């Protein structure tokens, strides 16, 4: 790894699958002006091979009137952690008018992103997955030690994102679940505080 390169930290379930179609997310506004709801669909990987945080934020800003409710719907295996964190923070800044909706899967970086919403509703047959960040590396021993340090630091960012959503969660238990790569059912996610409500889905 180049000593000047920023490591790309992944938080993604499974191996990356190359596809050509990049239309993996969409935004739409529905209803009259007084009852307008903005829906953001994040369906696919997060990062340069799918939807980047820059695209997400710029498109959301173009539609957001500062008043209407925003629903961010997720079906994503995750991707680039830093893009996920940026999405998390963008949703958090919307405050109480933002709802995160897990339609099928919010894994890895997507689980970090959706937890930025004020309220999270998870479909009864959906899942949320949490695990350690990971990356690729090359270089000498010093390079690998530096990469390990960065992974430790990004782990703290992940824990902080989950704790912001679920402040009452036992941190030791949270760290154990993250380290073990844990797949949570809808009811388990609600029990932990990472989701607020089980929605439709079956």
Place the predicted regions along the sequence by residue.
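N-terminal organellar transit peptides
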Residues: 1-109, 116-202
């Amino acid at each position: 790894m180049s000593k000047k390169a920023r490591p790309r930290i992944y938080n993604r379930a499974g191996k990356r699958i190359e596809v050509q179609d990049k239309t993996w997310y969409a935004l739409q506004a529905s209803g009259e002006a007084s009852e307008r709801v903005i829906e953001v669909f994040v369906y696919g990987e997060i990062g340069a091979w799918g939807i980047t945080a820059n695209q997400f934020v710029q498109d959301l800003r173009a539609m957001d009137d500062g008043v209407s409710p925003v629903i961010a719907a997720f079906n994503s295996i995750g991707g680039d952690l830093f893009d996920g964190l940026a999405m998390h923070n963008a949703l958090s800044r919307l405050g109480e008018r933002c709802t995160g909706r897990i339609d099928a899967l919010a894994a890895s970086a997507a689980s970090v992103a959706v937890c930025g919403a004020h309220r999270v509703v998870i479909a009864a047959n959906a899942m949320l997955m949490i695990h350690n960040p990971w990356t690729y590396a090359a270089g000498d021993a010093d390079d690998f030690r530096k990469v390990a340090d960065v992974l430790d630091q990004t782990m703290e960012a992940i824990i902080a994102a989950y704790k912001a959503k679920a402040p009452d969660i036992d941190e030791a238990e949270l760290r154990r679940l993250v380290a073990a790569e844990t797949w949570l059912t809808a009811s388990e996610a609600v029990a932990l505080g990472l989701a607020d409500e089980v929605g439709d889905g079956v």
